[in-house]
Amino acid sequence: MTTWYRIIAGVTRTFSFKRGPVGCVALAVLFAACSSTMPPPNDEAVIGGGVTRHSLVFIIHGDGDYLYHNTLGEARRADEDILAQAQAIARKLPNAEVTIFHEIARRHVLFLIPRHDGRAFYYRQGKLLGKTSYWRDQGNSRFAPEADLYAKFADAQSTSPVRMFLYFGHELPELNVQGYDASYPDRRVSVGDLAQGLSTFTGAADKFDLVVLGTCFGGTPHTIDALAPYARTIIASPGDLHLSYFDLEPLATLDIKRDDGAVTAFADRFARNAFDRLTRDVQTAVSVVVYDVNATQAFRAAVAEDYDRTLAMANGMPASVSHCDCADDPAYAHSEMSNGLTVLYRAPRFGRMKNDTHHSGWECWNTGEVQHADNPDNAGARP
C-alpha cells in the first residue's frame, strides 16, 4: 500500500523573523498553511478497484466581487456556493475522478506573510484523496498552476473516460485587459488564456466531451471559436448569468458513455435544469445555450472577420458599446446561424425587452452603428 505523504507546497518566498514567541508562532502558521496532502497515485487499497469512467475538472474563480444576497437577505459568496456544490457532487460519484480548483483572493497572515491564493481538491470514487494550496502566479501561463497540479492528480490508468470541464466566474474578456484578478490588478486576462489552459489539460490528442462556461456573455462567436479546438460540446450563456443560481445537481447521477449521443443528451438535460432554476429564481433575462462545436463551425468561420472588426472597434470606444443579440446585426444574418444550437431563452420580466420571445443563441457587440436586421427567414433572428 502506498503511504500517504506530506509535502510542503511550493513556497517561493523567504522571510526572516526575530527570535521570540511571535516569530515562532508566525513560522508555525506559515508551515501549517503550506502543508498539503497529495493523493497516492494509484493505490487500489485506498481507492478501491473501481474504474474511472468520468473525469471532471472545475475551476472556480473567487478572486473578485462575488458577494450577493439571497432571497432571505443573507449575504453569500457565489464562488463559495459553487464550491460547496462541486464538492457535494464529487462525493456522490462512485465511478469518477473530480478535480476542483478554487482561485481565491491573496491574504496575509499577521499582515506580513502572504498565504496561498489557490486551493485544489482531488476526489476519486467519492473519496477526497488529496488537497493542497498553491500560488496562482507560478508558471508561464494563466492556468499553468492548475494544469500542473491536474497532471499530478489525474488517474493515469483510466481509459477514455467521459471528460468534462467547468469554469465559473465573471465574464472572461475577449481582449487582454487588466483587472480580472483582484489580487493581480496588472495581469492581463482573456478567453484566450482559458483556451490555452484547456489545451494543456486535454493534451495534444484529445478534447473535453463537454465544457461548461458558467460566466456572463460566454456565448459569443469569438469565445466559442477560441474554445472549439478543445471541446466537442459547450454550454454557455450569451447573456447575463447569475452564478449563484447555476445548478450542478444533474452531475450527481452522472452515468454516461461517449457513444450513442449520450453526452449530447446529458448536455441538453444539464442546460435545461440550469435554465429552469434560473427562470424560477431571477426576473432578468435568462439564456442558456448548448453548442455542438462541429455543427457551428460554418457560422463561426463566416462571421469571424466581421466579429473581429467589431471587437477592435469596441475596444476603442468602451463607453459606447453594449452587448446585443447577433441577430440584430445584418452582418451576422447567415443561414448557418442556428446550426448546432439548442437555445433556451426567457425574456426579462420588465423593461424594453420584456416582450422578446427569441434569442439567436449568439451574443455580439453593438457599437451604436448597427440597425436591427431585417431577416425574417433566419431562424435565429428575433421575431
Model-derived segments and their meaning:
Residues 1-18:
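N-terminal secretory signal peptides that target proteins for export/translocation
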Residues 13-15, 29, 297:
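Short non-domain terminal segments
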Residues 19-27:
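Sec-dependent N-terminal signal peptides
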Residues 32-33:
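C-terminal motif of bacterial Sec signal peptides marking the signal peptidase cleavage site
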Residues 41-80, 84-103, 109-383:
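Terminal, contiguous helix-loop blocks that mediate binding/assembly
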